[in-house]
């Protein structure tokens, strides 16, 4: 909010002549970024902003998509919104992340990591570790959030910063 939300319409306008797929991501809490719910420019607010100037339609959503996709009528490109905070999609997320130092995470917000690199270096089978990572996945948002009035609240995030996770 109040950082670059004034550029949303410009990015959507860019999809008119360019076959690009623009993604808007809600502000997410990570170590050091001073996140709060008040700073989140939500999925609904993004769509409200887009509808000030454009008529759009929702595109097909696959089971494990993390973004809701849209096309403005007459545009060759598309735009999408990753609504991590206002409309979490955790129940359909099938993503695993491998960090640059060989740790596997089952959620961007998860504080737990599984050491894949050491197993690879020791010639061990990594399939049990991948299964462990999947089974340890929390129900929502890495298990680090509580909900107050339907909005996720952060007590104290225990995690790497996004630049150290990759993504």
Where are the regions that the model predicts?
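Conserved C-terminal portion of the radical SAM core fold
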Residues: 1-33, 48-54, 101
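Short, solvent-exposed polar/charged micro-motifs at secondary-structure junctions
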Residues: 4-7, 33-35, 67-74, 152-159
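Short, electropositive alpha-helical surface patch
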Residues: 4-21, 75-87, 160-164
């Amino acid at each position: 909010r109040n950082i670059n939300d004034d550029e949303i319409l410009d990015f959507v306008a860019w999809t008119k002549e360019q076959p690009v797929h623009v993604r808007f991501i809600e502000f997410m809490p990570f170590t050091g970024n001073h996140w709060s719910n008040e700073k989140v420019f939500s999925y609904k607010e993004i769509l409200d902003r887009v509808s000030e100037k454009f008529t759009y339609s929702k595109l097909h959503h696959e089971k494990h998509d993390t973004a809701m996709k849209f096309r403005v009528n007459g545009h060759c490109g598309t735009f999408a919104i990753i609504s991590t905070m206002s409309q979490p999609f955790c129940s359909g997320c099938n993503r695993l992340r491998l960090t640059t130092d060989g740790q596997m995470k089952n959620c961007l917000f998860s504080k737990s990591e599984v050491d894949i690199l050491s197993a690879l270096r020791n010639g061990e089978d990594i399939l049990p570790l991948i299964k462990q990572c999947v089974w340890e996945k929390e129900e929502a948002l890495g298990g680090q959030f509580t909900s107050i009035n339907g909005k996720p609240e952060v007590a104290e995030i225990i995690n790497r910063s996004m630049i150290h996770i990759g993504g």
